[in-house]
Amino acid sequence: MKCLKDGHMHSHYCPHGTKDSFQMYIERALDVGLDEITFTEHMPLPGIFMDEKLLKECSPNEEEILLYLKEATKIKEEYKDKIKINVGLEVDYVEGYEEKIKKMLDNYGEYLDEGILSVHFLRLDDVYHCLDMSVDEFGIIAKILGGVEKVYDKYFETLIKSINADLGSYKPKRIGHPTLVRIFNEKYPMDYKNEALIDKVIKKI
């Protein structure tokens, strides 16, 4: 029997998401026939490596994430007879902050059923850029690297680094939106041909 699952859901704790309650997400999941869902709110970022105002829009802070984990755990128990709910985090891989990410995962690990590991940030000569922040920012990244194809290369190379990184025993086993680099494909179309690099990513996943 096929199990219908949504393994990447955010919550009202997400600064750039909706304010819909856990109950609204769950009731909608039941309405469309899902058997299992995973809440994967963004884990707090591991440091201030870019504009602080921008970073505050990316994830809950440490106080908020504890509230999220505790509320999600409570909701999971309340609905256990209706739907399987997993409590998780979306862990943003930030190159150079591996040790801090590992420590944070150790702190939150007791609450986690699963998680996803994602790449939103690219480090270019020790300056960080948010890949999916805006079309304009994507264009800046492409200009620095020397073209859109180079952005794809850098993204997939960073994705491989995230998979190889030692993030401890609570490191997520799933990769979030591995084609995120295509987010502005309408503005920056690319028929990406680096099959060798894509094969490396697929083998790692």
What residues fall within each predicted segment?
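An N-terminally biased module of ancient metal coordination in phosphate/nucleic-acid-related enzymes
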Residues: 1-95, 99-103, 107, 184-204
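Domain-core and long-helix interface of multi-subunit machines
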Residues: 13-15, 111-205
